[in-house]
Amino acid sequence: MCSVPISQTVRRACLLALCFGMAGVAPVRAADEQFESWTAKGQSTYIWQQKPGFGAAYSGQNSLSTAREKSYTFTATGYFGVRPWSGGEVYFNPEVTQGSAFSNLSGLAGFTNGELTKVSGTNPTFYRQRLFLRQTFNLGGGREQIESDLNQMAGMVDKNRFVLTVGNFSVLDVFDDNAYAKDPRTQFMNWDNWSYAAFDYAADSRGYGWGFAAEWYKDDWVVRFGRMTGPRQPNGLPLDYQIGRHYGDQLEVERGYSIGELPGKVRVLAWRNRAILANYNDALTYGLTNPGDPDHQWITKVRTGEKIKYGFGVNVEQAVAKYAGVFLRAMKADGRSETYAFTEADASLSAGVSLDGGAWGRGKDTAGIALARNMLSPDRRNYLAAGGISFFIGDGALNYRGENLFEVYYSLNIWRKVGLSLDYQHVQNPAYNADRGPVNFYGARLHAEF
């Protein structure tokens, strides 16, 4: 993969420095302020990664390159919000992105950088990331403080409440939260660790869509339901706005609890997509009956008719000490249809530990270590083994094994809300193929909020 031209590197460094400078001079409300009627915040993140060359018995159209490669992403985002009336909040997020992926973003299920979903090339791209309304209806049960954060204004709400979010946002803004493994800009970088890899949630190729989400908070329980638009074509950028016909539904139940004085949460999630998708058995039949077709992306030849795709998952976060917590995610999808909007996994499992630097006198530092495993359904395995090419993966053959990940990171706070992270990832059986790899990835991340 070509290196980034010097001029682009200089421009990117200058923009990042400007953002970091703003972190020191931009007006920010005091942390102890109890109410905000408006908010203006931002973030800037640069992630650089490198992988050495690795061994493989063979390579195909959508294989991870065996050569040494570099990858990077840069994002800068504005978070603007205002309260137009009681209980109402309107948010607008513009964002600029640029970057370059390993092997044109192919050859893995668990990609190594969560920011890669947003970039579309080495030229800066400006777009509207989010534009949504959040309305809170207070229902009693006592009051609690909401802290100021990105897309969140400080204020008091009832413990029992109904919250409606409508507009342009991400499924992951509302569902599948986790205190220890959620944000690739500050925590684990790999896709396996900031959501379920098998959660094929409806969104455009950047991870956003239009729709609604309703949340009912009652004591230690939360029930959420949402419907979102998906892409016109699987993993495409243009959205299909026929939300009554093609959509992704999510239902999540959350229970908060404590073991002694150590808090924890369990979330159970069910999702269901309806869209025009290819069935893997149909695609395999096409490939076997048309051996002369040079295009082995057979899924595109049978992408007719509406299909239902669904899955179930459980998400756990648990503090185990004052400065330590653990997380677990497990999900199983039906695995009959092609990937709709996320990555190539039909079952996924991830677990890890997060450590707060307060344990060693560095209260704003964080460290984490995690293991993950992704798996494929028999239908998808057979398709790939016969030489079929999917959206992200396809080696031309398949000696199937689960794709395994080990990730460890350390995030060092270097000034105010500026952090520098080092990250290492080891992937065994990339794209589920025991004939390729293993692969090592080394990364660094610079992140600022202002």
Show which residues each predicted segment covers.
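Residue-level signature of outer-membrane beta-barrel architecture
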Residues: E33, V82-P84, P94, Q135-F137, ...
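Hydrophobic, lipid-facing positions within transmembrane beta-strands of outer-membrane proteins
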Residues: W38, Y72-G78, Y127-L131, F162, ...
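Outer-membrane beta-barrel "beta-signal"
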Residues: Q129-G142, I369, P438-F450
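Signature for the C-terminal beta-barrel architecture of outer-membrane proteins
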Residues: W191-V316, Y323-V326, A330-S337, E344, ...
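Surface-exposed strand-loop-strand hairpins of Gram-negative outer-membrane beta-barrel proteins
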Residues: Q50-T73, N178-A181, D435
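Transmembrane beta-barrel strands of outer-membrane/channel proteins
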Residues: A40, S44-W48, F92-V96, L164-N168, ...
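Surface-exposed coil loops of outer-membrane beta-barrel proteins
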Residues: S106-N123, Y127, G142-G248, E252, ...
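Short loop/turn motifs that connect adjacent beta-strands in outer-membrane beta-barrel proteins
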Residues: A31-A40, P52-G53, G81-V90, N138-R161, ...
